[in-house]
Amino acid sequence: MSRTAGGSTRLLLGLAAVAVAFAAADTYVVVLALPDMMISVGLGIDELQRAAPIISGFLLGYVAMLPLIGRIADIRGRVPVLVASLVVFAFGSLVTALAFDLPSVVTGRFLQGVGGGGLVPATLALVADLYPVERRAVPLGVVSAVQEVGSVLGPLYGAVVLAVADWEGIFWLNMAVGLVLAAALTRLGPKPAARSVVEEPAEASVSKPPLPDILSMLLLLVALAALVLLLWEPPALYNDVTLGLPFVPVSGDSRWFTPLALVTIVATVALVARCLLAKRPLVDLRSWGASFGRADPVGATILALALAGVILAFASADPSQQVFSPIGGFLLAGSAIAAVLFVWHLRRARNPLIPRGSLREMPAWASLLVSFFVGASLIAALVDIPVYARLTTYKDSQLQAALVLLRLLVAIPIGAVAGGFLTRRLPAGVVCGAGMVLSTAGFAWMSQWGAHSLENQIVTVPLFVTGLGFGLALAPVNAALLASTDAAVHGVASALAVVARMVGMLVGISALTTIGLRQYFEALRRRPGHELAAALVQIEAIFVGAAICSLVAGALALVLFSGAKTRAAPPRREGANAASSRADRA
């Protein structure tokens, strides 16, 4: 792919960044819609623990499938994977919007996670394809900034939609935007070269693009229409004596035993068969299957199991009560076994998921370590700043508590862009280390807050400084990783960095909350009845722990990113060039 930053290149990258931002917004939008979603699937507001799979299902799809998607992006190309991810995201949004019970909601959210997660490594790898090493830090910073803007606007986006529509409207809009972006990327993306151009140039010059396979399109329409009717059950049809017969189960009471479900399954199977056998299929499943086979599905499955155990152990726990879920010990033991098996598999596989030597350079594997500690620190801000606000000044306003966090979040995209520009001029380790020092200072300041600190506007300073520090670290971490790995593994390497950050967030919130809870109960033991004072001690301990994580991330970056060649080589002085030339002649 061309490395010239022309108009089409910028537009292509811009669309990919918008897709990443939209998926990031969807990550947070469900927070507002969750109560209504719970009621729609028959759960009470007090059954948050049973609704946990709605969150963990998305995380599972987002994280566990990332390495496989990143590897496929290396094999098949960035734009095809971006388009496929958007289609999966749109289909997951459709399933979620039409969901009728908890399993269908979780399925839809899982598919949304798979699609949304696949956008990030493909976009980062696309930046590396389009820009040379010395020029990619700024676009990496812009992509990171746009992603963080999406995270900031996610709750606002959800609130606006919920003000005029039900929660399903969020996911209908997600589906529409996903399909529009997929169509735009398809049109802008590189076209495969036609084999007939060399052999028959005259004919190729006047030939028209082949028509899509009509039968495949008809089967797709039938399958989608049947699925929509199956999930929706429109009353006008469902309650009719004759037209309602396709909705009546032939056995039991499950929708999946109705004639309409049979039509959905048969049409889907026929569509898959047609795409495998047709000369010009609607979706080239044979080619995608070959790419999937080369991406090491066995290794990806083992790694997904290892990640799934970690995600389910921590994401389904109540941090206020426990480090991980009641079965978390068994899940983590299973993850450990899967991790050992994965390492053994990588050593023996012919085409491993992570090609041998991919992360041999120190800045490459160091980027994963830094991402882990950045995630562990960041999650403390995202979770505990609103908690602190609700405990103290804004006891009755979740909105005001969220606006306190917004003062930190708005600084992250600013820092991300600034970090991109700075990384073009300074070593990546210095920029990342400086950012993490700022975050450390911000957390240290916040750890001194008392019961009335939010009444003083000076609290905006540590919030903004902390967010700015996190933003500064984003571009140099990605730049160091991409500069220290081969282009053939940029997709899977970027995916591993995202996975490291997400796992760091999950482990971090559980570990820091556990430390905070110990301080809370110790404070209560010393001063019984002073719950607010004990809660402030808990928050203080969490912020101190987050400051330590930030400091560790900065120190690792400063030391281990030293060999990352993220800048252009400085021009040699004219005198030095002349001396070198004379030495060569001698």
What name fits each language-model region?
Residues 74, 79-286:
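Helix-loop-helix hairpins in multi-pass membrane proteins, especially solute transporters
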Residues 23, 55-62, 89, 113, ...:
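Structural signature of transmembrane alpha-helices in multi-pass secondary transporters
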Residues 11-38, 46-56, 295-300, 312, ...:
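Transmembrane core module of solute transporters
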Residues 1-8, 193-211, 282-289, 560-586:
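Intrinsic disorder in cytosolic terminal tails and internal cytosolic loops
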Residues 65, 76-83, 134, 400-573:
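C-terminal module of multi-pass small-molecule transporters
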Residues 24, 28, 97, 113-121, ...:
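Small-residue-rich segments within alpha-helical transmembrane domains of MFS-like 12-TM solute carriers
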Residues 37-38, 72-73, 157-165, 389-390, ...:
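Interfacial helix-cap and linker-helix signal at transmembrane-aqueous boundaries
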Residues 31, 121, 151-159, 307, ...:
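Glycine/proline-centered helix-kink
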